Every structure is written in structure tokens, then in C-alpha cells.
């Protein structure tokens, strides 16, 4: 495909094109089955009915944090088959869950601006071939350029500059996995309906991460103090906080 904007239609007919390592994102069709969606949506309503911690609302987007013991996280990750699909899509060597969110685009809300989620640009791991963290965005409704579909700039996870934009119009139950370093945003939500998305954040190769990155991530408040699930990260050293830097170096 050449420059400009490519639109992936519902059904993911172009899905084989996108590779997480090469492009910085990939499409996972039907990660959540249609029959599961009503129960998942009901869980989302329960989450949003409660009080949100400070800082959850940002321009044109609300994020409600999810802990490991949240029923909606358990519902999504209890399935061994779903875990297998996730590990395969992420080419994971040692998949571990780090955190989760409900992401809301309100009706008639503006586009979410271009940004990157990576938080430690001063660290050498930022320039690794492999992603240190991946966000899996699970959509609970169909999306389009009118209903806050995700927009991405392929290759920007490796510092490349591009004017090429891909719009990922997906079906309810589909997911998009994004390298934390990828430039991404959304279209506006021009509809009268809310656009809900679940974000599940993973380290695809936990044991291969630098010690100080693991020492920082193990402190994430979404993680339980103790747990023996194979998706939970483990760390035997002293937890520590790294200096955050969310500003990628100029290219």
C-alpha cells in the first residue's frame, strides 16, 4: 500500500498485512465472541457507575482503571483459548498482564490527538526490536471514522517518520494490539452513542525485560500483592520507581 490513509473495513480483510513487530500493531479478529458481549458491556456499566480516581478524564477520553481482580478482567482472561490467541498474536515469549482500563469516547466527542503510550524514553529498551509493552484494545461496538475508530501511523514504534495513517474500522469483539511506542489516536465520535473499549496491557517477554523495567512495572497498582496465576508478573528483586519520560526523541 502506498502513502495516505488506508481504511481497514469491518471484517478485517486487510488484517494479514499488519505485523506487530514490523508495523507496531496487529488486528485480532473476534477475540471476544458476539455471545459474550452483552455480559462484558454490563460489567463495563458497573465499572463506570462507580467513582473514578483523580486523573481518569483527559481531553475527549475517559479511562477507568481495572485491577487484576476486577470481574471484567477475570471474564476476559479466564479462557485458556483466549490466552493462547493473545500469546500467538503478540508472539509472546513470556506473556504477563500489567494493567487494564475501560476507555470511553463519549457521544459527540472530538478526536483523541496523536500520542505514544511509552513512558520511559530515556531507557535503552525503548529502542529494542521487541516491544517492552503492548496494549490490547478490545472494542465493544463496531467502529468507523464516524465512531471513534483507532488511527495509527505504521512504523513509528521504531522512530520512523511517516505521513501514512491507517484507520482501523473494526467489529464489536475485535481487538487491536499496539506497541506502546506506536503513534496512535482516534477519529471523533460523531454519533449519539458512547464508544467503549477495554484496554489490557501486557509485557510479551517479561523475563527478558531489563531488571529495572521489571522492578518498576511490578509496582503497578493494578497488580495484586500476591498471586500465582501464570499471567501475573513475578520479581524477586527490590521494586523501584524509574524516572518517567513520555516524550520520544526527535527523529
Question: Which stretches of residues belong to each language-model region?
Answer:
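Conserved double-stranded beta-helix
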Residues: 2, 157-251
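Non-heme Fe(II)-dependent double-stranded beta-helix
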Residues: 2-22, 29-124
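A structural signal for short, well-ordered beta-strand segments and their strand-loop junctions
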Residues: 27-30, 96-98, 149-152, 177-178
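Short, solvent-exposed loop/turn segments at secondary-structure junctions
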Residues: 33-34, 102-105, 119, 143-145, ...
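A short, structural micro-pattern
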Residues: 96, 130-132, 192-194
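A structural signal for short, well-ordered beta-strand segments
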Residues: 99-102, 136-138, 198-202
Amino acid at each position: 500500500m502506498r502513502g495516505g490513509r488506508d481504511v481497514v473495513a469491518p471484517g478485517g480483510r486487510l488484517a494479514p498485512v499488519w505485523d506487530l513487530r514490523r508495523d507496531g500493531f496487529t488486528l485480532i479478529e473476534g477475540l471476544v465472541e458476539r455471545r459474550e458481549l452483552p455480559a462484558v458491556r454490563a460489567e463495563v456499566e458497573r465499572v463506570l457507575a462507580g467513582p473514578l480516581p483523580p486523573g481518569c478524564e483527559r481531553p475527549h477520553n475517559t479511562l477507568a482503571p481495572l485491577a487484576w481482580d476486577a470481574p471484567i478482567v477475570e471474564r476476559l482472561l479466564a479462557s485458556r483459548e483466549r490466552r493462547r490467541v493473545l500469546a500467538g498474536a503478540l508472539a509472546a515469549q513470556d506473556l504477563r498482564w500489567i494493567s487494564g482500563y475501560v476507555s470511553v469516547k463519549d457521544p459527540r466527542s472530538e478526536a483523541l490527538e496523536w500520542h505514544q503510550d511509552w513512558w520511559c524514553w530515556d531507557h535503552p529498551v525503548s529502542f529494542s526490536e521487541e516491544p517492552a509493552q503492548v496494549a490490547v484494545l478490545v472494542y465493544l461496538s463496531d467502529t468507523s471514522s464516524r465512531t471513534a475508530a483507532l488511527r495509527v501511523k505504521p512504523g513509528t514504534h521504531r522512530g520512523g517518520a511517516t505521513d501514512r495513517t491507517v484507520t482501523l474500522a473494526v467489529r464489536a469483539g475485535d481487538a487491536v494490539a499496539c506497541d506502546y511506542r506506536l503513534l496512535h489516536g482516534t477519529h471523533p465520535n460523531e454519533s449519539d452513542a458512547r464508544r467503549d473499549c477495554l484496554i489490557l496491557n501486557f509485557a510479551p517477554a517479561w523475563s527478558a525485560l531489563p531488571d529495572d523495567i521489571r522492578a518498576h512495572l511490578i509496582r503497578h497498582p493494578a497488580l495484586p500483592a500476591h498471586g500465582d496465576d501464570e499471567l501475573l508478573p513475578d520479581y524477586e528483586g527490590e521494586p523501584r520507581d524509574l524516572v518517567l519520560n513520555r516524550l520520544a526523541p526527535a527523529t
